[in-house]
């Protein structure tokens, strides 16, 4: 009895473990979930975030451009022999000289007794250097650093938009390959059923051997297509798993919702202009050029510094017996070898290039938005046609099977109808997902993918 109880417990535990494994294998990932995983696992996004942090540190450094600098220097010297200082002198005549019309004697002091001084010598110096005014260069350096922070944050948004688009492409590629596999499985099932019917007719003398061979050939072709579809699905899942840093391929995808869409060109153009990372980047660079111009124009303005120094020196380190001095200094650049003018010329050339790039970029954006809208319209029309074709192909297939069963049609008619139905199902499935992809591509081209997944990204960053 005890052994039976242990056996039942073992069976229950095994069932639980298998259930857990099944649940893990059957894990479903939504498009929102994929974006969450991307935000968590993307090393490229991590690198861009580090760039933002680095730019913010540069901004803090620029803000400290007028900060005081305090320097402390100390030294100690031990002499090999103690120095001597004279304490008594004698006067010794050295001759006569004419002084103011009279002849007078000259003398010199000759030391005769000495005292030893300390062999120790201490020295300490405290210096404070404070820039008071640097010709407005610090203020402009802060402005440049602020623009650099904005540029790095803009680069993060651009990178995030591109990475989300990569995820969407890989995500829908898996859905397409999965749907193709389902079509191939269903096709194989239909061919197998037809083969069974042909074999029965052959055994009953109602079909010839070549009919059986034709269907078996078609069955083998269906198996080959099935193996190819299975392999393509594995590759597509592996690419998505690599993007999301998933450990294995034991997952399935949930079909995402279709974003709401306005098919107005001007509406999407305005969104693209407002959200274009490249356009915003060019505008920031133009502002940075303006700041650089201002810095070059202020190069010949004076700079002022305040310097304070307190020094103590002696055989004892007595901080109360030091010397203090304070200095106010100024400097101005009178001539820089014409470098400033050359730099201004270079900045003006860069500004002209930025304006040309901006004009070309706006033209490119318009082309991409028009192409995206045309693709949506094309896929929508193709999808309607594909759905009608599927209905007709299914009717033809059912009619061919019915005619074959009634002895009116031959086996090849059924195979042709089945092949046509299979191709139309594949086309309809691909067109359906391509239509969804084209809608998401419009979000990508308008730079609004980040906004569409904003809540998902925010929830992950909390």
Regions inferred by a protein language model and the residue ranges of each:
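Amphipathic alpha-helical coiled-coil segments
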Residues: 47-62, 159, 163-182, 193, ...
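Amphipathic alpha-helical coiled-coil scaffold segments and their short linker/junction regions
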Residues: 35-41, 91-111, 246-306, 451-462
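Small/polar (Gly/Ser/Thr/Ala-rich) solvent-exposed segments
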Residues: 46, 69-84, 113-119, 129-158, ...
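Periplasmic alpha-helical coiled-coil/stalk elements that build and connect Gram-negative outer-membrane
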Residues: 1-8, 29-33, 57, 158-271, ...
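Acidic, low-complexity, intrinsically disordered peripheral segments
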Residues: 32, 78-84, 89, 427-462
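Bacterial N-terminal signal peptides
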Residues: 10-20
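Sec/Tat signal peptide C-region and signal peptidase I cleavage site
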Residues: 20-26
């Amino acid at each position: 009895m005890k052994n039976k109880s242990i056996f039942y417990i073992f069976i229950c535990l095994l069932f639980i473990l298998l259930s857990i494994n099944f649940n893990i294998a059957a894990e479903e990932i939504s498009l929102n979930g994929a974006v969450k995983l991307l935000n968590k696992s993307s090393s490229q996004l991590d690198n861009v975030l580090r760039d933002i942090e680095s730019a913010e540190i540069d901004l803090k450094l620029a803000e400290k451009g007028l900060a005081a600098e305090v320097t402390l220097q100390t030294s100690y010297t031990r002499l090999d022999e103690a120095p001597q200082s004279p304490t008594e002198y004698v006067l010794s005549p050295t001759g006569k000289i004419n002084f103011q019309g009279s002849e007078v004697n000259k003398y010199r002091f000759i030391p005769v007794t000495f005292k030893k001084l300390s062999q120790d010598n201490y020295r300490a110096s405290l210096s404070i250097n404070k820039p008071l005014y640097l010709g407005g260069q610090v203020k402009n350096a802060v402005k440049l650093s602020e623009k650099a922070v904005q540029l790095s944050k803009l680069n993060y948004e651009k990178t995030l938009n591109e990475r989300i688009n990569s995820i969407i492409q890989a995500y829908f590629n898996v859905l397409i390959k999965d749907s193709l596999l389902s079509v191939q499985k269903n096709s194989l099932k239909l061919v197998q059923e037809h083969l069974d019917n042909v074999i029965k007719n052959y055994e009953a003398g109602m079909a010839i051997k070549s009919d059986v061979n034709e269907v078996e050939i078609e069955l083998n072709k269906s198996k080959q297509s099935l193996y190819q579809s299975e392999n393509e699905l594995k590759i597509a899942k592996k690419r998505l798993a690599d993007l999301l840093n998933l450990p294995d391929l034991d997952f399935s995808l949930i079909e995402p919702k279709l974003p709401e869409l306005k098919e107005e060109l001007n509406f999407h153009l305005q969104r693209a202009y407002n959200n274009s990372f490249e356009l915003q980047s060019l505008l920031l660079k133009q502002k940075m050029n303006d700041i650089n111009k201002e810095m070059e124009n202020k190069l010949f303005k004076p700079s002022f510094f305040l310097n304070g120094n307190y020094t103590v020196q002696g055989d004892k380190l007595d901080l109360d017996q030091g010397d203090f001095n304070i200095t106010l200094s100024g400097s101005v650049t009178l001539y820089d070898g014409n470098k400033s003018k050359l730099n201004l010329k270079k900045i003006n050339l860069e500004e002209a290039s930025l304006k040309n790039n901006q004009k070309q970029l706006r033209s490119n954006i318009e082309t991409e938005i028009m192409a995206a809208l045309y693709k949506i319209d094309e896929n929508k029309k193709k999808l309607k046609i594909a759905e009608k074709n599927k209905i007709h192909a299914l009717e033809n297939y059912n009619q061919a099977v019915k005619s074959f069963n009634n002895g009116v049609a031959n086996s090849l008619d059924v195979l042709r109808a089945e092949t046509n139905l299979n191709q139309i199902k594949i086309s309809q499935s691909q067109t359906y997902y391509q239509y969804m992809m084209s809608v998401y591509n419009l979000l990508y081209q308008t730079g609004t993918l980040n906004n569409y997944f904003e809540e998902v990204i925010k929830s992950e960053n909390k």
